[in-house]
Amino acid sequence: MKNNNSTIAAHNNTPTLAISDNRGLAIRALAYNRIHTSDAPEELITRNRYNAVGQLIASRDARLDSDNFRYQYPLGGAALRTDGVDNGTSMQLTNIEGRPVMSLDAKGTRSWVTYEPELGRPLAHQQQPEGGQKTVTDRFFYGENSAEHKAANINGQCIRHYDTAGLQQVDSLSISGVALQQQRQLLTDTLGPVNWFGEEQSWASRLRRESFVTRCTTDILGQLITQTDAKGHTQRMAYNRAGQLSGSWLTIKNGAEQVIVKSLDYSAAGQKLREESGNSVVTEYRYEAETQRLIGIKTTRPAI
């Protein structure tokens, strides 16, 4: 109890205060801190400045006597240039629709994004380190207006994404957008640079033949009912009438189903009251009646 009281005393009279201007913008943040109970609280001030339209243009914390961050904006509103004492200078250009098209980080690495002219969906990401070669790091392909893709609910969705790890492919989606079947193929060369330049037909040799497939089933609300991973292990979930998790099970490939969560009880406010695990360990939660804040957790297990 003595240690607990000393911990409480160290936090006494150390509030965090926020000060706003007449536009509701946070212009000051005051934090008070002490290490030992005998120390006077140290005041730490963060100062923010805004332009006429309410955009943050500079921020200064308690470490320095100058700005930590400075921001410049174009007419579109997204930050055009950011200067930071820790992360250097970065810039980002957007198109008329607000989508990023080119960026430059503090290391001199340039990045570009190419979009479809009509729908604005991303088609490719390109990257060029300072003094290095320009490469295509990502390519995106979308479901076509075909009977096959409509049946799998992937019409117009991103179904193949070539990235720096290989190929991520979506085979079918639920009505709520949850991936029902997806697969991953990894690169054959994991050490060399990744460049998805050219036509898709020429990339097959860069990928390993093995595909890691994940399959799911969902309910009408889009919540997972079962999920089978690439190793063949299956998770199963159950829900109550309110859509809250009521139990879960795990089946290791070629094994028997095991109980992970045996039961769950909730309050009328949706807060977890009691959870019994598959090994019969019970965890109970208590909440303050007035504020509904968590005030206690008790875990018990049966005697061996």
Region locations from a protein language model:
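Beta-strand elements of repeat-based all-beta scaffolds
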Residues: M1-I304
